[in-house]
Amino acid sequence: MKKIGIIIVVLALIIGISDFAFAGSNPLKAKEKEVVNSFYAMIPDDHKIDVFKLHEVWQKAMADPAYRKKIYLIDVRSHPEFYAFHIEGTDHFHAGHMYGIPKKIKDPNAEIYVWCRTSHRSRYVAGFLYKYGYKNVYWVGPTTKNGKRYRGGVVGWAQAGFPFVNQFTGKFKIVEYRKHPSKKEMSFNIREFHPY
């Protein structure tokens, strides 16, 4: 009986280890990386910018309405992400609906800036826009400045201390961005009561 128990434990360990081994060598994950890199390669190097350059463009657009009408500042995060917070005065186009961009932006030479949470989705969108025939698309990616690493997208924008807005609170800054809340934060129960 003892031998059967040991055999079962050993088999369970072997199966568990093999699952991890196969998960690590997922050919589809490698192919996705290859595809996203092919889209990234389509973006000219001088059109790969960081949040500091985006901030300069954004400040100019906010100060000059005529310039703002000529450019497109597009956040490609999901709708809930955008509604939670976004960069003031920017446009929103969900990455999954990028096929609709040519219907809205008809000039292939339009100046277009795209970003997402960090930079992954926007790489796809920027690559697709170049495939569509746009010539002047800027992708907001990561950078290192004064020895500090900044992500691309709104995470990098928050790291740099730049402001956000939403429809509920107005303008604000995120003092610490975390993708995953702490255990303490997860322990808070928000009870919502409805009058109906």
Regions found by a protein language model. Give the residues of each.
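Rhodanese-like catalytic fold shared by cysteine-dependent sulfurtransferases
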Residues: 20-60, 67, 80-111, 120-196
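Short helix-onset patch at the extreme N-terminus, typifying the N->h transition
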Residues: 6-9, 66
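Bacterial N-terminal signal peptides
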Residues: 8-16
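Short, surface-exposed ligand- or partner-binding patches at beta-edge/loop junctions that are enriched
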Residues: 115-116
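Periplasmic peptidoglycan-binding/tethering modules of Gram-negative envelope proteins
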Residues: 65-71
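Short hydrophobic beta-strand that contains or immediately precedes a catalytic carboxylate
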Residues: 54, 72-77
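Positively charged n-region of N-terminal signal peptides that target proteins for export
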Residues: 1-4
